[in-house]
Amino acid sequence: MARIRIALLLLGMLPVTAVTAAPQHAPWPGGIAVIDVGPAEAPRPFVEFDARRVLVTRNGDRWLAAVGIPLDAEPGERSIRVNTARDVAFEVREHAYSEQRLTVTNKKYVSPDEAELERIGRERRIIDAALGHWRDVDVDGLALAAPVDGLRSSSFGLRRFFNDQPRAPHKGMDIAAAEGTVIAAPGNGIVAATGDYFFNGKTVIVDHGQGFVTMYCHLSRIGVAEGQQLEAGEPIGAVGATGRVTGPHLHFGTYLNGTAVDPALLLQ
């Protein structure tokens, strides 16, 4: 099977008229590799990365794949499979994330008991299924509006310690805002799931198509229902302090091919 290396397209190299169709090329852990996969006069290609379907969007006269790179990916050469017939290589670069230490007063959110761990496991399966869902529709672009105005209080990828105990890296962007502040859908989509979860609190997950999914956590109230069609700007809930938090804020997560990626790369 032929192995073909195709040059990666940086946004700065794209025509001005097509800039909004593709995210920033950021080929590092937690980032997005933007890869040219062929001329747009051909049908939209079938692209996979690590056995997961990858979003492909039209950008001018080309098809571009937007590959979410896992936070734990090692630097080096990786590849995507295009139309099950050829491999396209790309390079994962090194990228350093800062450390964050937080104090949580409710100890159950640091050391859950057995019953709580069982609940966390059940909820994780529900959340993972929604975040990894594939809906085969055309996606015109990945640019998102900010879901709420506020201070970006914690960035993506932070290596986190709760009460000095190491925990998973931060897989979203925290936006500090007053409790009750309305959260707006940043783009068109369908509500994939809602729930009140142990760590995430009241949560909404929105499917924007082709594995492009956004998540909103710690809400004070949920204003949408599963399966509901959304247009950009529609309210989906309100900022709160439910779940594992140190104060009111929105945890905003963005996902491609089931992988958490930095929301800052997608915000307009």
Task: Walk through the language-model features, giving the residues of each.
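Cationic-aromatic interfacial patches
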Residues: 20-90, 94-96
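Positively charged n-region of N-terminal signal peptides that target proteins for export
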Residues: 1-5
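Bacterial N-terminal signal peptides
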Residues: 7-17
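Catalytic cores of peptidoglycan-degrading enzymes
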Residues: 145-268
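Surface-exposed, glycine-biased beta-strand/turn segments
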Residues: 21, 89-200
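Generic marker of residues within folded, mature protein domains
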Residues: 11-13, 25-27, 37, 46, ...
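A short local loop/turn or secondary-structure capping micro-motif enriched for an aromatic residue
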Residues: 55, 64, 74, 96-99, ...
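Intrinsically disordered, low-complexity segments enriched in proline/serine/threonine
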Residues: 17, 29-31, 149, 265
